[in-house]
């Protein structure tokens, strides 16, 4: 009985400590977002989407989409965007759940991002656009194009995921991880630790 009480106290203390750390990081990240925008927000139905533009408005549009990892953002494209802005009107976007865009507490799916990209092109760019996407985001672009061929004039994929990876379906093990990550204290802690450069576990 004594061991159980000790284990319970230790568990509660650990959870409480994680929550304190999470709140400190939350405050710092909110302050950073509020003071270092330098871009615009598209008020989408599922959350605000941060993006930056480069180049003249009358140049042909080009949409640059970053990879989908916990540390990804439009910053990945910054140097290239400045070079391309000599001939294109560049749109660098933070996908929902990444960078300075909103991070709603939902299960993110491929089709969710397909909808986001489709609406962004139609409501922000407002013209068929050349698009370049890295990693997993290439699959969102291809699906969006399959559903609406008027969105893009050209598609460029940088280091796209293999078809072997893309065809995988969630198994019971991954569903169990999802349930664990959906617990707010644990999910946020794993996210914050996984974005640290020296942290060995990537999600």
Language-model features, listed with the residues they occupy:
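Alpha/beta-hydrolase fold catalytic core
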Residues: 1-62, 86-88, 126
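Short beta-strand immediately N-terminal to the catalytic nucleophile in serine-hydrolase-like folds
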Residues: 131-134, 158
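Gly/Ala-rich beta-loop-alpha elbow adjacent to hydrolase catalytic centers
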Residues: 133, 137-141
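Active-site loop/oxyanion-hole signature of alpha/beta-hydrolase fold enzymes
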Residues: 78, 82, 92-132
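Flexible "cap/lid" loop of the alpha/beta hydrolase fold
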Residues: 143-147, 152-187
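Conserved alpha/beta-hydrolase catalytic His-Asp/Glu region
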Residues: 166-168, 187-203
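Conserved HGGG/HGGXW glycine-rich cap/lid loop of the alpha/beta-hydrolase fold
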Residues: 52-100
